[in-house]
């Protein structure tokens, strides 16, 4: 961004340290609040598009009053003649889910935990008319202790100029299921921004089910991915998703070994079906069927 850099002071108080990420027309910075002597994250948006900047600030104001530990906390909001800014809690020590998934898929029960927490956080914003609409693995932050937080609720959609239609709950439900798919397979199943992940594989022109890519996929997660991403069905809201996959572990589930199947190569088409996933049991959550 022209005119700002490390050392720039915003509102006479917030010192920019280093850029953290760029989404659409806004940049997140690692910063320092010189008044309270604490590290913060700043979302800085140029006011060359005043309507967009106003939408970002409006979304941030509504998000600031949602008290939920799964959402990135907003401390301050402001603007001057050049910039609009949103001051958030420090997230510089967290890793994005995209970064974690660049190392490979996660254990299925860790996917359940992360997506359950994300869904519960998004559900808390629904009462304020807030929807994410731009959910990707880059929006999910994981602390060193495993706490899950969602960034960009409302503001990412405003930055993108997304239409605030009446399908926000369903779009976020699809986004959460896409996160589950990515967590299970390490690939992104939706069009648009992949957050650096590879595109999901297809089989005979259709999106491969997670169980066709990796082993050990619980039946309920496999079915939710199929219904939501391939059949335009599945959960209608993040809260609906959370209810369907509950309960989940309150603590992180660590990786033990790679779950990638050697039977399913990352092809884009072809009619040869992969080797069948592990057989089903009476408990649908134990493993997915072929």
Label every PLM stretch briefly.
Residues 81-89, 97-98:
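A conserved loop-to-beta-strand element in the N-lobe of protein kinase catalytic cores
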Residues 77:
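Activation-segment/catalytic-loop signature of the eukaryotic protein kinase fold
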Residues 122, 126-143, 152, 157:
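Catalytic-loop of the protein kinase fold
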Residues 18, 24-53:
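ATP-binding glycine-rich loop module of kinase domains
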Residues 162-253:
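C-terminal lobe helix-coil module of Hanks-type protein kinase domains
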Residues 96-106:
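AlphaC helix of the protein kinase catalytic domain
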Residues 44-66, 72:
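AlphaC helix of the eukaryotic protein kinase fold
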Residues 114-115:
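Activation segment signature within eukaryotic-like protein kinase domains
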